[in-house]
């Protein structure tokens, strides 16, 4: 059975770096590898939900900044449908830098989160929950 989920919350552009050791103060480290992907709690949950054969719809602030195209492209490749709460927003989307220590999987994250990406709830269509089996709100 395929479920349909609505995922509501933060979308970021994540720069994820794999490092052989954690960063220390005043240290510069060359990464072993990196990824640039759409991220954020609701976004990651939508991608995972879709990966397991379900249909995910993401309700979030995306906007029209050039960096947003990277987010939209990644979500499209993952099969996640999006509803943009502020499609005309031209500001830079929230960006996260994540350093993952290869040996342990421990990570350090710095991000602005949704501080500058608050949406007006009146934009949401009244029939948004039609044919939705599951709703996730990430708190952002």
Identify the meaning behind each predicted range.
Residues 1-11, 61, 72-87, 99-140:
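Ribokinase/PfkB-type carbohydrate-kinase core domain
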Residues 1-61, 66-70:
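Glycine-rich phosphate/adenosyl-contacting loop at the front of the ribokinase-like
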Residues 25-26, 30, 95, 112, ...:
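Residue-level signature of transmembrane alpha-helix interfaces in integral membrane proteins
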Residues 32, 39, 95, 137-138:
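Thr-Gly-centered strand-to-loop micro-motif
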Residues 37-44, 89-92, 116-121:
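Short secondary-structure boundary/capping elements
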Residues 52, 78, 91-94:
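Short, basic and Ser/Thr-rich N-terminal targeting/leader segments
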Residues 68, 72, 94-96:
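Generic internal hydrophobic packing segments that stabilize the cores of diverse globular domains
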